[in-house]
Design a protein with these regions (language model features):
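Membrane-interface "cap" regions at the ends of multi-pass membrane proteins
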Residues: 1-33, 62-67, 71-84, 88-92, ...
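Transmembrane helix-boundary motif of multi-pass solute transporters/channels
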Residues: 14-54, 236-239, 250-253, 257-260, ...
C-alpha cells in the first residue's frame, strides 16, 4: 500500500465549500427530468419512501467510501486505486472511474447548450414558439444552432475550471446552489397553486400501492445511484480536495439532503403543473428531453406568467447543468494533472478539446450526422448507454471490492475519525459495502442494460 500525502494539492476552503460543490455535482438534469417521471409512474409516496431509504443506506455508503478513498490518498481515481496495489483489476477500477466523466461531460454539455437556447428564447419573449409542435425537433436538427449553443456551454464550464478549485468550482457552487434552491421553491409554490394542481400533488406524494412492484425498488435504486454522482470519479476527486478536519459523515448527510430536497421540489414543480395542463392525465408525463423541452414549454404557455416562469425554470435548469458539468470536467482535469503531470491550464485545454470533439458528435447526431448510428443508437444515446448503463455500475462494483477486500474497514474508519472522532453508522456501512451494495450494483447493471435494449420499461 503506497499512500503519500500530497500537501500541494488544491483543496476546498472547508465543509461548506465541499458540501455545496458535491451537492452541485449531484443535483443535475436527472433530478429534474427523470425523478418526477419515475415517482409518478411507480407509486408516488411509495417511490419517495424507498428512494429516501436507499439514499440513507446505499447512497450513504458509496459516498462515504469514495470520499474517504479520495481524502486518504489525495489523488484522483487512477492514482487512488493504484495506491493500494499493482494488481490489474485495481488499475482497471481506477481507469474506468476516470474515463466515465470524460465520456459524460461532452454530451451533457450538448444538453446544457439546449438549455441555454431555451433560456435565451424565453428572455426574448418567444415562449409561444417554444410551445409549438416540432420546435424542439427542428432545433436539434439544425446543426449550426445546436453546435453554437454547445460551444458556449463548454466555454463557460472550462472558464470555471481554469479558475481552480476554490476560486472556480467552490465560488460558483456557493452562488448557484442557494439560488437554485430559492428558484425551485418559488416555482414549486407557483405550480402547486394552479387550478387543478392539487390532484398532481396527491398523485406525487400519496402512496399508491396499486402501482407498487419490485420495479419500484429497482427504479428508485437506479435513480438514486445516478442522482448522487456515484461511480463517476467525482466524489473520489472531491474527496481528495477535502480537508482532514471536515467530517465525512456529516458532509455526506448534507449532500443527501440537498439532492433529495431538490428532487422532491422538481416533482412539485413539474407533476402538479402537468396535471393542471392535461386535466389530470398522468400519461402526459414523460422522462428525459421530451419532458423538459416539449411538454414543459406547452405547460408554461397555458399558465399565467408563463414567460416569467419559463425564464426562472430554465435558469434553474442551467444552474443544475453547470454545477454538474464543472464537477465532471474537474474529475477529468484532475486525472490529467495527476497521471501526466500537466498544469491545470494545460489539462483543461486538452479536456476541452476532447469535450468539443466528442460533444460535436452528439450535437450533430440529430442533424447532419443523423444517418450515423451505432448499435441502433445516435451518438448521444450511445455515450449515455455506455456510461450510465454499463460503465458506472462496474465502476461502483470496483469501489466496493477495493474497500471491502483491499483497503479494509479499519482504514476507512481511521480516515473518517479524522474529522469527527466517531464512525456513527459503521455497522450500516460494513453490511452495505461488503454484502448489499455489490448486489444492488449488479441489479442496477442488469436492469439498466435491459431497459436500454428495450427488454424492460423503466
Amino acid at each position: 500500500m503506497d499512500i503519500q500525502n500530497n500537501n500541494n494539492r488544491s483543496s476546498f476552503s472547508g465543509k461548506i465549500g465541499y458540501v455545496l460543490s458535491a451537492a452541485g455535482a449531484s443535483v443535475g438534469l436527472g433530478n429534474i427530468w427523470r425523478f418526477p417521471y419515475l415517482a409518478a409512474k411507480y407509486g408516488g409516496g411509495i417511490f419517495l419512501l424507498i428512494y429516501i431509504l436507499l439514499a440513507l443506506t446505499f447512497g450513504y455508503t458509496m459516498i462515504v467510501a469514495e470520499s474517504a478513498i479520495g481524502r486518504m490518498t489525495r489523488k484522483s481515481p487512477v492514482g487512488a486505486f493504484r495506491s493500494f496495489g499493482k494488481k490489474k483489476w485495481l488499475s482497471f477500477g481506477g481507469w474506468i472511474n476516470a474515463i466515465i466523466p470524460v465520456l459524460i461531460v461532452p454530451y451533457y454539455s450538448v444538453i446544457g447548450g439546449w438549455v441555454i437556447k431555451y433560456l435565451v428564447e424565453y428572455v426574448k419573449g418567444n415562449g409561444k414558439n417554444l410551445a409549438k409542435d416540432g420546435y424542439f425537433t427542428d432545433f436539434i436538427s439544425n446543426g449550426v444552432s445546436t453546435e453554437l449553443c454547445f460551444i458556449v456551454f463548454c466555454l463557460f464550464t472550462l472558464g470555471i475550471i481554469f479558475a481552480g478549485v476554490q476560486n472556480g468550482i467552490e465560488r460558483v457552487s456557493k452562488i448557484m446552489m442557494p439560488v437554485l434552491i430559492v428558484l425551485s421553491i418559488l416555482i414549486a409554490v407557483y405550480s402547486v397553486t394552479r387550478p387543478g394542481a392539487l390532484k398532481g400533488v396527491r398523485y406525487f406524494l400519496v402512496p399508491n400501492f396499486d402501482n407498487f412492484s419490485w420495479m419500484t425498488v429497482v427504479a428508485a435504486m437506479g435513480q438514486m445511484f445516478y442522482s448522487l454522482s456515484i461511480a463517476m470519479g467525482i466524489l473520489i476527486t472531491f474527496g481528495s480536495y477535502m480537508k482532514k478536519d471536515t467530517a465525512i459523515e456529516d458532509a455526506t448527510r448534507n449532500v443527501e439532503v440537498f439532492d433529495t430536497a431538490i428532487a422532491i421540489m422538481a416533482g412539485l414543480m413539474i407533476i402538479p403543473a402537468v396535471f393542471a395542463f392535461s386535466g389530470g392525465n398522468p400519461d402526459t408525463l414523460q422522462a428525459g428531453p421530451s419532458l423538459m423541452f416539449i411538454t414543459i414549454p406547452k405547460v408554461f404557455q397555458n399558465m399565467g406568467l408563463g414567460t416569467i416562469v419559463g425564464i426562472l425554470f430554465f435558469l434553474l435548469v442551467l444552474f443544475a447543468a453547470v454545477t454538474s458539468s464543472i464537477a465532471l470536467t474537474e474529475s477529468a482535469v484532475s486525472t490529467f494533472e495527476d497521471e501526466i503531470g500537466w498544469s491545470r491550464k494545460k489539462a483543461t485545454v486538452y479536456v476541452g478539446v476532447i469535450m468539443l470533439i466528442l460533444g460535436s458528435l452528439s450535437s450533430l447526431g440529430y442533424g447532419p450526422l443523423a444517418c450515423v448510428k451505432i448499435i441502433g443508437m445516435q451518438f448521444l444515446d450511445l455515450f449515455d448507454f455506455l456510461t450510465n448503463s454499463v460503465m458506472m455500475p462496474i465502476a461502483a462494483l470496483m469501489t466496493c471490492l477495493l474497500v471491502s477486500r483491499v483497503v479494509g474497514i479499519d482504514k476507512i474508519e481511521e480516515e473518517i475519525r479524522h474529522g469527527e472522532g466517531a464512525f456513527r453508522r459503521k455497522k450500516i456501512f460494513v453490511v452495505m459495502i461488503k454484502y448489499i451494495c455489490p448486489v444492488f450494483v449488479l441489479i442496477i447493471l442488469a436492469s439498466s442494460v435491459a431497459n436500454a435494449l428495450g427488454w424492460i420499461s423503466m
